[in-house]
Design a protein with these regions (language model features):
Chain A
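Glycine-rich phosphate-binding loops of nucleotide-dependent enzymes
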Residues: 2-262
Length: 262, 373
């Protein structure tokens, strides 16, 4: 990957305390354009706190947070969004009863006309939605159909397409495949691959090493609020990754005990 | 219907690759379908059973007057329901706003215009309080506004006794507002000249002296129609409309997408209370007095009209024009039965059945539309 510029997002020694609880204890990571960084870690490792910090939901207690080399201090999710960091949450992305178009433009409706008659240009919205869906290979017969009619994978793709359309430089995907079946998962993974080729940085959070290994360029493993290490794909096998993620030894012992089925 | 067909052809022009969506699917996707079908059913029923005078101009006005007063509440209740909340205090709010309005006019001798503005501001404030309590306590709005149903009704009684020295009715409002310039906007009939002209042209029934039998359209009907159009436009065409659907559909997803959910909901509560105040002002000016039973049980009727109009109880889905038709169904049945041989006490039976049917139908349609299983 030809990265002439530095990383888009770089965090160094991020610490976050919730009262007396230390959620993040000096986490460092970075992601560049055209790269998929996979964030792995068991429950309680600090993945969600790290995502919340990156997406402006919580503010770090200390540490350095650079976006394109400039130090930032986000006060709201909106501020992170404006800086080009878009987060797609696993189940809170779409409203099933609303149309695809209305979901796509939710919170960022393009306006037309003067103030008492100012309205949303839904004709334009429908065209854009149909076009964007077409690009990612989802055949939307009618952008006015409810999102509830789409499959889980398609919904994730719509949410990602929305973030891309609105100019995200970095996509944070919070377990986008955890609730999906096999076919749906491959659809989402394929789309993540497409997004990378467009030159966006992707931070992909998952439990599933197999999904991670399929698309990621690098892996950062979190454990108990700290970075356990960052590995390029060429430096690590899927088994090693699995062991690192689940705390190494224990799982290996368990695996042997179960006859190597995990 | 013509509008829908136009839309389809426009879409075909834009992109010929897209298969046209069948008219039936488009219709099914409209939340107000049930209400329109219901209204047709009701009208056919009365065509067959009622005295033909029901469908005269005078008969229609008799139906539309109560329908419009309920409808103003129902449209606001529909918007609030789409936004994901209920307001059970609107009926009591009508009584309380009526008291505030009456006291401002009589006890404080305010001008009509001033009294109207102050009553509206006061109602908006009370609505916003409702909203703030619901938002900050995260209690269901059902229970918070149920509390206000009793609080406001009780305050109305106490306030009326205080204002009148022991009575539960405040009279003499008519004399205070006789000469007010703004009276015509909130009271009586509108378009009187047009009706005189229509009578001259022999287009409508008239008395032997040449005056029309129906002197005009009650102003409440015009308010009702205007609000229905405005609310429909806001819902379907504006950013605020999208935010209302989003806030009711899934507040978390909406917030993550940058929708100010709390502001939207607070605004809707204030709007609902203002609609109650508007009904209070119109009915108090018409009656020339206000009493403690004003708006009694209107909260249920408004919610029923909204549900018949296609609103889901869980929020995020519904229509204002549906509530418009829901309110007209309500008015047609309550008044229409007096034109038939049936006992008009069948009204409530009919209403309950209608509500049950509407809810079943809405659920069915929602599953169809969203592919929910």
């Amino acid at each position: 990957m030809a990265n002439t510029k530095g990383p888009i997002i770089q965090v160094t020694d991020i610490v976050k305390h919730y009262g007396s609880v230390i959620a993040l204890n000096g986490v460092s990571m970075h992601v560049s354009a055209g790269e998929v960084l996979c964030l792995l870690g068991d429950n309680g490792a600090g993945k969600s706190t790290l995502i919340k910090t990156l997406s402006g939901v919580v503010r770090p207690s200390s540490g350095q947070f650079l976006v394109e080399g400039e130090p930032v201090n986000f006060t709201s999710p909106r501020a992170a969004l404006d800086a080009g960091i878009a987060t797609v949450y696993q189940d809170l992305a779409m409203i099933p009863l609303m149309s695809i178009t209305r979901n796509f433009f939710m919170g960022r409706e393009p306006l037309k006309g003067f103030i008492p008659f100012r309205h949303v240009d839904f004709k334009h919205c429908n065209e854009v939605t149909r076009e964007e869906m077409h690009k990612i290979g989802i055949d939307v017969r009618d952008p006015n159909q409810a999102v509830g009619t789409l499959s889980g994978g398609e919904r994730q793709c719509v949410a990602i397409a929305r973030a891309v359309y609105f100019g995200a430089k970095v996509l944070i995907l919070d377990e986008p495949t955890s609730a999906l079946g096999v076919a749906q998962t491959s659809m989402v993974l394929k789309y993540i691959h497409q997004v990378r080729q467009k030159g966006l940085g992707v931070i992909f959070i998952t439990h599933n090493v197999r999904h991670a290994y399929a698309v990621a360029d690098r892996f950062t493993i979190l454990n108990r609020g700290q970075t356990l290490g960052t590995y390029a794909k060429s430096d690590i096998t899927m088994d090693e990754l699995q062991n690192l993620m689940a705390g190494g030894k224990e799982l290996q012992q368990l695996s042997e005990g179960l006859g190597g089925t995990i | 219907m013509a509008l829908l067909e136009q839309k389809t052809t426009a879409a075909q022009k834009v992109d010929e690759r897209i298969k046209p969506v069948s008219l039936l699917t488009q219709l099914m996707r409209r939340p107000e379908l049930g209400a329109v079908a219901g209204l047709i059913l009701v009208l056919v029923f009365f065509f067959l059973t009622a005295d033909p005078t029901m469908f005269s101009l005078a008969g229609l006005m008799t139906i539309m007057a109560p329908a419009s007063q309920l409808g103003i509440l129902a449209i606001a209740a529909a918007l609030l329901m789409i936004g994901g909340e209920f307001d059970l205090s609107i009926g009591s709010m009508v009584a309380f706003a009526g008291l505030v309005f009456g006291v401002l006019l009589t006890n404080f001798g305010q001008q009509l215009a001033v009294a109207i503005v102050l009553t509206m501001l006061f109602a908006a404030f009370m609505g916003a309080i409702n909203g703030q309590i619901v938002i900050h306590t995260r209690l269901p709005s059902f229970i918070v506004t149920l509390a206000f149903l009793f609080i406001l009704r009780g305050l109305t009684l106490v306030g009326l006794k205080w204002a009148t020295g022991g009575s539960t009715q405040l009279r003499g409002i008519g004399e205070h507002v006789k000469d007010s310039a703004s009276l015509a906007i909130f009271s009586g009939d509108a378009l009187k000249d047009a009706f005189v002209w229509l009578a001259d042209q022999d287009l409508i029934d008239k008395f032997p002296n040449g005056m029309p039998k129906v002197s005009g359209i009650p102003v409440s009907v015009l308010w009702f129609a205007a609000l229905a159009l405005l609310a429909t436009w806001v819902l379907l065409r504006t950013r605020m409309g999208n935010w209302i659907f989003a806030a009711g559909g899934d507040p978390n997803a909406a917030r993550n997408s940058g929708v100010p959910v709390h502001r939207v909901k607070t605004g809707l509560f204030a709007l609902t209370a203002c609609a109650a105040a508007l009904v209070a002002i119109i009915t108090v000016l018409d009656a020339g007095s206000t009493d403690a039973r004003r708006g009694f049980q209107k909260e249920f009727e408004a919610i029923i009209a909204a549900v018949i109009g296609g609103c889901l109880l869980t929020g995020g889905y519904g229509s204002a024009i549906g509530a418009f038709f829901g309110a007209i169904i309500f008015g047609s049945v309550s008044i229409g039965l007096t034109y038939t041989k049936f006992d008009s006490d069948w009204f409530q039976v009919f209403l309950g059945s209608m509500l049950l049917l509407a809810v079943l139908f809405n659920n069915f349609i929602r599953r169809k539309v969203t592919g929910e299983r």
